[in-house]
Design a protein with these regions (language model features):
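Bacterial N-terminal signal peptides
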Residues: 9-17
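Bacterial N-terminal signal peptides that target proteins for export
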Residues: 1-9
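Acidic, polar-rich low-complexity tracts and alpha-helical solenoid repeat scaffolds
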Residues: 16, 20-266
Length: 266
């Protein structure tokens, strides 16, 4: 009796699974589509700005036809669809997966570029970096990750069509990070945390020696040493400032570090 009941239940479950599978297939209009047709439709959705629908089609293509040129191209375009949806983590993950699986693919430079772009928080903009509100706690890791990815792209693919833009973004990142450190150093100085101000200013000199922010970083060091009554170090810093930036506005006008940054340059 128990065996019969068990067989009956298993049969019922099997029928239910088949039924559900059939129902799911009936709801999928792409079930009989070729790889070419799915890709073409996904591309059309992408061009129309329907990135979520395009992503679903690319996923379907990769699941059904995991091998061949359409699948690999779908992987690349999937990165872009995630990026345009604002799913930056997914875009980065997809780019990493493509780079690892297809290191010699002709389009791998695009994967590097999109990974860098996803990390490069384009919505933050310059004024996000200038803001003092939470700069001391701001996470700069995405910027640094973007820089390293763009650097790898530029190094490995110097002739890539994405390299010129990557170089521009790398320069932006360096200046943005340097500005962030200078603002943080100024923040520490205002709160009489002079040693912390010196340490942050030194980071600008060591990490971003060619950035325009070096000038103010040296000035903050000089003023911080002065506030700590470290006369020799303060004089040395002012001497370096005078040598490297003889026309420095900090030497001419001696603006207060407590003066808002925008008043110093306007």
């Amino acid at each position: 009796m128990n065996i019969s009941i068990t067989r009956f239940l298993l049969l019922t479950l099997s029928l239910a699974i088949v039924s559900c599978s059939s129902a799911t297939d009936d709801l999928d209009p792409t079930k009989n589509w070729s790889a070419s047709k799915i890709y073409t439709e996904a591309k059309a959705q992408m061009l129309d700005g329907n990135y979520e629908q395009a992503a679903k089609l690319y996923e379907s293509l990769q699941t059904r036809y995991p091998y061949g040129i359409y699948s690999q191209q779908a992987e690349l375009e999937q990165i872009y669809s995630y990026y345009k949806q604002g799913e930056k983590a997914s875009a980065i993950s997809e780019a990493d997966r493509f780079i690892k699986a297809h290191p010699s693919h002709p389009g791998v430079d695009y994967a590097y570029y999109m990974k860098g772009l996803a990390n490069f928080d384009d919505d933050l903009g310059l004024f996000g970096v200038y803001s003092q509100s939470d700069l001391a706690q701001r996470d700069s890791k995405p910027y640094r990750d973007a820089f390293e990815t763009f650097k790898e792209l530029v190094t490995r693919f110097p002739k890539s069509k994405y390299t010129p833009d990557a170089v521009v973004r790398m320069r932006y990142i360096v200046n943005a990070l340097a500005k962030g450190d200078v603002i943080t150093a100024r923040y520490y100085y205002k709160r009489q945390a002079y040693l912390a101000a010196v340490d942050r200013a030194k980071e600008v000199l060591s990490q971003y020696p060619k950035s325009p922010q070096v000038e103010e970083a040296i000035y903050i060091m000089a003023k911080s040493y002065q506030a700590m009554h470290l006369t020799k170090l303060s004089e040395d810093a002012f001497r370096v400032l005078n040598r490297d930036f003889p026309n420095s506005r900090f030497l001419k006008n001696k603006p207060s570090i407590n003066t808002p940054w925008w008043k110093k340059i306007l």
